[in-house]
Amino acid sequence: MKNLVGRFMRYVTFDTQSKPKNHHCPSSTGQKVFAQALYEELLELGLSDVSLDDHGYVMAKLPSNVNYPVPAIGFIAHMDTSPDACGKHVKPQIVEDYQGGDIALGKGDEVLSPIQYPDLHLLHGYNLITTDGTTLLGADNKAGIAEIITAMEILLADSSIPHGDISIAFTPDEEIGRGANHFDVAKFAAQWAYTIDGGPIGELEYENFNAATATVVCHGVNLHPGTAKDKMVNAMHIAAQFILMMPENETPQHTEGYQGFYHLSGATMSVAKSELKYILRDFEASGLQARQALMQAKVAELNQQLKKGRVEVSFEQSYSNMKEKVEPHPHIIELAKQAMVACDVEPKIKPIRGGTDGARLSFMGLPCPNIFTGGYNFHGIHEFITIEGMEAAVQVIMKLAEKTALHYRQ
């Protein structure tokens, strides 16, 4: 465990932001550099079958140390960080024995405040790792990588802990929805796996959104504004009308738990043509279909109102709820719960209001729920993680391996 924090602090200095407009895999050269460093570290640790493929996927195995058959299990984390905030020149800072109040982030005016982030009230006495207020931290998901590798390092050194074959993998471009695109499930050779990509201590997740992207294109008529009377149709005004027609109370800032939403995530505006990007989320497949139908109805309604100009909408499916693929294998969740309880961690089963590599992998034949990292406030400059949460994740990974081996000895 002694190498955990240093390992994490080293990993976050790699600039690995994924780039959604680059369709190569990985989408950024920083991920290639980080993947090479991880590949070399895994070789040095002495893991077996260490590989780095042309798409930047790193895989390795820890062979079984028991003399009876145990299904191979896997642990997965992703190397990229979110494009939503700067991920370059990350300068983590450690706050020891937090006792409440605002935490100054670096030398600027940014603070981490319990007023804005009430979870801090529950973390008195914990040791935190924060940003310096200028970048994200990268705990999502470099904490998961550090935790998996540290667990493998300890299991390699301590033969008294029984375990079957363990496969590990580190993927590129998860943050832009492509983490499973080139994942070789057959090569990974696990019966099931866990992504270590969750938040606070105890999180255990096997439900996620059904997801789609909607593109709304508004077509106008552009003319010289000096001669535009009764002729110009401003596509930006049409786009504004459409935005106001959407349900205001079904947006991310007004929803929680199992509630889905419409999220206007981007726009490209001009008089002649304006384009709106929405992400649609719902835990039920029928709910996602209903959201798409509502958008189609709003487009038809707006087209009827327009004397000139027109609107069209198209959809692209992103990922589906892994619940239907994980629930038929209840032992996967039960073993994770048992491992947490054995580590004095209370399991907190909740839906993922997002997606993980595990969601896609579950539909590729590798059931793959999600386990906590100990982190908070991902994708922004107020991201932080507790050292205690990271240590608990390492313990749970090792205990899961042990519990699985003992379960199949019986």
Curated annotation (Swiss-Prot):
PROSITE patterns, per database record: ARGE_DAPE_CPG2_1 (PS00758), ARGE_DAPE_CPG2_2 (PS00759)
Enzyme nomenclature, EC number: 3.4.11.4
InterPro entries: ArgE/DapE_CS, Bact_exopeptidase_dim_dom, Peptidase_M20, Peptidase_M20_dimer, Peptidase_M20B
GO CC terms, sorted: cytosol
Pfam families (UniProt xref): M20_dimer, Peptidase_M20
Gene3D superfamilies per UniProt: 3.30.70.360, Zn peptidases
Annotated Zn(2+) 2 binding sites: D140, E175, H379
Record text on cofactor binding: Binds 2 Zn(2+) ions per subunit.
Cofactor(s) essential for the protein: Zn(2+)
Keyword Cell inner membrane tagged: no
Keyword Protease listed: yes
Residues annotated to bind Zn(2+) 1: H78, D140, D197
Location of the active site: D80, E174 (proton acceptor)
Single GO molecular function: metallopeptidase activity
UniProt keyword list: Aminopeptidase, Cytoplasm, Hydrolase, Metal-binding, Metalloprotease, Protease, Zinc
Main location: cytoplasm
Family: Belongs to the peptidase M20B family.
NCBIfam families: peptidase-T, PRK05469.1, PRK13381.1
Physiological role: Cleaves the N-terminal amino acid of tripeptides.
Protein name in the entry: Peptidase T
GN (gene name): pepT
